[in-house]
């Protein structure tokens, strides 16, 4: 189980990403459309002025059951240990253990 403070930090990051997504996208579109280097520099400074945790690449995928940051399967949102345990218990519909 991950520390509650780490899980809370990730929740806060997700909220910030959602809050600033539109503003960040519009600034990035302006940045890519600008031809003048000075104009690009000015827009880049505006992007840098946004909160650091509002960047989507700062968000880490975590297991929703345990909060573990590693070995998380995107399809289920579970870490490998929880995925195995829940699959054996039959809690994941459609998931079948392979045999050949």
Curated annotation (Swiss-Prot):
Keywords: Ribonucleoprotein, Ribosomal protein, RNA-binding, rRNA-binding. One of its GO terms (biological process) is translation. GO terms for molecular function: rRNA binding; structural constituent of ribosome. Disulfide bonds: none annotated. SUPFAM superfamilies: Glucocorticoid receptor-like (DNA-binding domain) (SSF57716). One of its GO terms (cellular component) is cytoplasm. InterPro entries: Ribosomal_uS14, Ribosomal_uS14_bac/plastid, Ribosomal_uS14_CS. Part of the 30S ribosomal subunit. Contacts proteins S3 and S10. Belongs to the universal ribosomal protein uS14 family. Binds 16S rRNA, required for the assembly of 30S particles and may also be responsible for determining the conformation of the 16S rRNA at the A site. This is Small ribosomal subunit protein uS14. It comes from Prochlorococcus marinus (strain MIT 9301). The gene is rpsN.
């Amino acid at each position: 189980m991950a520390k509650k403070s780490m899980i809370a930090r990730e929740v806060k990051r997700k909220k910030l990403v959602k809050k600033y997504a539109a503003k960040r996208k519009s600034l990035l579109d302006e940045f890519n459309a600008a031809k003048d280097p000075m104009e690009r520099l000015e827009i880049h400074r505006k992007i840098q002025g946004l909160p650091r945790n509002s960047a989507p690449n700062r968000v880490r995928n975590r297991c929703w059951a345990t909060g573990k940051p590693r070995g998380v399967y995107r399809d289920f949102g579970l870490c490998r240990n929880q995925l195995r345990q829940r699959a054996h218990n039959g809690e994941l519909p459609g998931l079948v253990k392979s045999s050949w």
